[in-house]
């Protein structure tokens, strides 16, 4: 079974980590069998599964239900579950109560969004036995504060993002996840922090990559984000597409230049 220690060893060895979102047992089992090391039960289910316009309405009850489903299908992969909006920002104690429910539902790690100001919560949780994935850069739960889905780290804000990563690393975060971050900045963060980094739209130099399952399978028609690749193209089954994703992450051929944000 994949553990925090496994991820640390992979970072040290330079072996890339493959992560995908999963929301139910059958896809979790398929991804697990295909060699995906980490399954993210993301609040992205609000849009991908529930048909909502953002992640904000997703409840802790929703997250626990889908975590239970994924846990029934996964045998080897590490399950990371999102703390949903409103379930952890009020206090460290509120965060622990919500995280404990997710862990009881089958999660092995919880993910929270936020920079330096959330590092205290990261420390509070990890000291009480709950591994934390700290999500920095573009944080979808704060999309209205950002004014939309924008690339992070431009306009003199690189140091602030680096400070966010350092704060969570110092607080004991098991993983730092960066979303929509300039590739060179993400590389610097990866070289600076001791914990593994996972990128989504954060270049090829992170310790691992993650995509939303529906995006990498080309389920949603129309325009997709720059960092998305449809792995169903050229493959005749979902399992073949997932295996291709894992292989490209491991070979460092995904993300390619066309998927990367640069100045």
Curated annotation (Swiss-Prot):
Pfam families of this UniProt entry? Pantoate_transf
Pathway field of the UniProt record reads: Cofactor biosynthesis; (R)-pantothenate biosynthesis; (R)-pantoate from 3-methyl-2-oxobutanoate: step 1/2
Q: Which UniProt keywords apply?
A: Cytoplasm, Magnesium, Metal-binding, Pantothenate biosynthesis, Transferase
The EC designation for this entry is: 2.1.2.11
Active-site residues are 179 (proton acceptor)
Q: How is the cofactor bound?
A: Binds 1 Mg(2+) ion per subunit.
The entry's 3-methyl-2-oxobutanoate-binding residues are 43-44, 82, 111
**Per the UniProt entry, what is one GO biological process?**
pantothenate biosynthetic process
Write out the residues that bind Mg(2+): 43, 82, 113
Where does this chain mainly localize?
cytoplasm
**Which branch of life, at top level?**
Bacteria
Outline the subunit composition.
Answer: Homodecamer; pentamer of dimers.
PANTHER family the record matches = 3-METHYL-2-OXOBUTANOATE HYDROXYMETHYLTRANSFERASE
Tell me the function of this protein: Catalyzes the reversible reaction in which hydroxymethyl group from 5,10-methylenetetrahydrofolate is transferred onto alpha-ketoisovalerate to form ketopantoate.
Q: What is this protein called?
A: 3-methyl-2-oxobutanoate hydroxymethyltransferase
């Amino acid at each position: 079974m994949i553990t925090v220690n496994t991820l640390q060893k992979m970072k040290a060895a330079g072996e890339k980590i493959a992560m995908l979102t999963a929301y139910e047992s059958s896809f979790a089992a398929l991804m697990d069998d295909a060699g995906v090391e980490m399954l993210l039960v993301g609040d992205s289910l609000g849009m991908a599964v529930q048909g909502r316009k953002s992640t904000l309405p997703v409840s802790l009850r929703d997250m626990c239900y889908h975590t239970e489903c994924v846990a029934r299908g996964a045998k080897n992969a590490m399950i990371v579950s999102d703390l949903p909006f409103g379930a952890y920002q009020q206090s460290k104690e509120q965060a622990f109560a919500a995280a404990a429910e997710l862990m009881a539902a089958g999660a092995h790690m919880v993910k929270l969004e936020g920079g330096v100001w959330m590092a205290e919560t990261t420390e509070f949780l990890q000291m009480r036995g709950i591994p934390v994935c700290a999500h920095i850069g573009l944080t979808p739960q704060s999309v209205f504060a950002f004014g939309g889905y924008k690339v992070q780290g431009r306009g003199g804000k690189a140091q602030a993002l680096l400070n966010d990563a350092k704060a969570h690393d110092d607080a004991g975060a098991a993983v730092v996840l960066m979303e929509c971050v300039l590739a060179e900045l993400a590389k610097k963060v990866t070289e600076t922090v001791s914990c593994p980094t996972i990128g989504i739209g954060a270049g090829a130099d992170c310790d691992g990559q993650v995509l939303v399952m529906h995006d990498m399978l080309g389920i949603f028609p129309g325009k997709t984000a720059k960092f998305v690749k449809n792995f169903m193209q050229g493959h005749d089954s979902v399992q073949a597409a997932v295996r291709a994703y894992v292989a490209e992450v491991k070979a460092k051929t995904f993300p390619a230049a066309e998927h990367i944000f640069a100045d």
